[in-house]
Amino acid sequence: MPGGPGLLQALCATTFLLFLISAGGLGPGSQALWVDGGPPSMTVSLGETARLQCLHNRSRLSSKLNITWWRVLQGNATWPDIFLSYGKGPNGELTIDTVNKSHMGMYRCQVEEKDLNQKILSSQQSCGTYLRVRERLPRPFLDMGEGTKNNIITAEGIILLFCAVVPGTLLLFRKRWQNMKFGVDAQDDYEDENLYEGLNLDDCSMYEDISRGLQGTYQDVGSLHIGDGDVQLEKP
């Protein structure tokens, strides 16, 4: 076969060269640029600080990364995204201080990898995170832990039990001491005081008026002065 051995050697050399190139491209420091998709949403309260991170991994150690944050406008897909700021720190963080209702929306980060000549080698962007803003939760009147609340309830129960048992016990001991000191006489005097309890005073006055009226119809013989003897005494 004409040119057979030479053609076979050329194919082997080409295959070996392609293998070396691919091995060098997949070696350390030559991996592809990677950007995390990020959380689908984030919820913060009014007045708080929102922090969005752009996790990424560069493909070359000598390259330079440019991280920017963009806000996606809602309602029309043809509208361009609004540039917000550059990412700060190793994770390209976006910080929004004193969040209000106007900050609600979709945010995404974009990572551009450049070489020493500021040439863009690759570019990736996150899927986007929707920022939700809610009303601040009302602060409870007693802002304390559950353990502290349980201790307070236990102390209140002990105090209530003390206030209910101790006065009753003292009254019982006082009554017992009075009975032992004064004896039965005090009880008899108390009964004598209540001997006429329930007696109707109006009935008593009526009987008293009747008795007084009867006394007026009789005459005392001893004190009667008889003159001429024609005085007649009434028989009872």
From Swiss-Prot:
GO terms for molecular function: transmembrane signaling receptor activity. SUPFAM superfamilies: Immunoglobulin. GO terms for cellular component: B cell receptor complex; external side of plasma membrane; IgM B cell receptor complex. GO terms for biological process: adaptive immune response; B cell differentiation; B cell receptor signaling pathway. The modification Phosphotyrosine is found at Y196, Y207, Y218. Residues 33-122 form the Ig-like C2-type domain. It is found in: Cell membrane. Residues 185-213 form the ITAM domain. The chain crosses the membrane at residues 152-172. It comes from the Eukaryota. The transmembrane helices of CD79A and CD79B chains and two IgM heavy chains assembly in a four-helix bundle structure that appears to be conserved among different BCR isotypes. Required in cooperation with CD79B for initiation of the signal transduction cascade activated by binding of antigen to the B-cell antigen receptor complex (BCR) which leads to internalization of the complex, trafficking to late endosomes and antigen presentation. Also required for BCR surface expression and for efficient differentiation of pro- and pre-B-cells. Stimulates SYK autophosphorylation and activation. Binds to BLNK, bringing BLNK into proximity with SYK and allowing SYK to phosphorylate BLNK. Also interacts with and increases activity of some Src-family tyrosine kinases. Heterodimer of alpha and beta chains; disulfide-linked. Part of the B-cell antigen receptor complex where the alpha/beta chain heterodimer is non-covalently associated with an antigen-specific membrane-bound surface immunoglobulin of two heavy chains and two light chains. Interacts through its phosphorylated ITAM domain with the SH2 domains of SYK which stimulates SYK autophosphorylation and activation. This is B-cell antigen receptor complex-associated protein alpha chain. The lineage of its organism: Eukaryota, Metazoa, Chordata, Craniata, Vertebrata.
